[in-house]
A protein has these predicted regions:
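Short, well-ordered loop/turn sites that connect or cap secondary structure elements
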Residues: 111-112, 165, 258
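Short N-terminal strand-loop motif that marks the start
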Residues: 1-85, 89
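Residue-level marker of beta-strand positions
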Residues: 34, 115-117, 127, 170, ...
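A structural motif shared across PLP-dependent enzymes of the aminotransferase-like
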Residues: 92, 120-133
Length: 273
């Protein structure tokens, strides 16, 4: 089968032929019909892969700590060899898709061969193996193309759950990419009043047309003033940050937009300084 992979060392993409995967007792084999490109996540993964070793270390201090621990227990030479081996590997891309079940592990219930499912954690491949708990049946009225958004949509929904908001709450969404647009729509569908902010005028227009009561191009103090007027001087009940930037501006701006004791949730990939 064909699968899209990326070099860990340099970020180069390749479409490769790989063996058909085998499933375990808790897994499901699915023939992919649609897979979703999560632009923010996949762009960040590719940017990290293309970075120098020093830049990789700064971006992933957790991995640096793993390397240090391994060097202490196994020695320097085995650690260097392990790091080089990891850098020479290729990793699959993608995590949100839909397709038709081909085979079901013996411990899986709720789906059977022939069912259409939305899947999470699967890459861009002709056939995918996913945990049975990450394969959700798709209603007949929902297309495969729409079902492929399920995992990304669940990320947006989880951000709103962490925000702990209800009908009538005022929610500001900072960053109107794919996850931000879904967050705004889900908040609106939950009965919230929604304001969206982004640096991209096109993204702001999309939100204004589909999901927000107020959509703003980020303009510093003017944006803060507009949010205060929209919230009648109170500030937002929750600020959900779905931006993708190395800058800490979104996290620094959020308190200016929020009321006293509001909730600020970071869903995106932003600086935290």
């Amino acid at each position: 089968m064909k699968q899209l992979v990326q070099s860990v060392r340099g970020g180069n993409l390749r479409l490769v032929e790989v063996p058909l995967p085998q499933i375990g007792p808790t897994e499901v084999l699915v023939a992919t019909s649609c897979s979703l490109v999560s632009a923010g996540t996949e762009r960040a993964v590719r940017r990290l892969a293309a970075a120098s070793l020093m830049e990789k270390a700064r971006a992933r201090p957790d991995l640096v700590r793993q390397v240090v621990r391994k060097a202490r227990t196994d020695g320097l030479r085995p650690t260097i060899d392990a790091v080089r081996t990891r850098l020479d590997e290729e990793m699959p891309l993608g995590y949100s898709a839909a397709g038709t079940v081909l085979e079901v592990g013996e411990a899986v219930s709720g789906v059977r061969p022939g069912d259409r499912v939305a899947t999470g954690g699967a890459g861009h491949a002709e056939v995918q193996v996913v945990a049975g708990l990450l394969a959700a049946p798709v209603p007949e009225t929902v297309s495969d193309a729409d079902a492929a958004f399920a995992t990304v949509g669940s990320i947006a929904l989880h951000g709103l759950r962490l925000a702990d908001i209800g009908p009538g709450a005022r929610v500001v969404v900072i960053g109107l990419g794919l996850v931000g647009q879904l967050t705004a729509r889900l908040a609106r569908a939950s009965g919230c009043q929604v304001a969206g902010i982004d640096v991209d005028p096109w993204a702001v227009r999309q939100a204004a047309d589909a999901s927000t009561d107020l959509a703003l191009v980020e303009a510093g103090p003017d944006t803060t003033q507009a949010i205060q007027e929209w919230s009648r001087g109170m500030g937002a009940d929750a600020v959900v940050i779905t931006a993708a930037t190395a800058s800490s501006d979104p996290i620094q701006r959020a308190p200016d937009l929020a009321r006293d004791r509001a909730t600020i949730v970071v869903v995106g990939d932003v600086g935290l300084e």
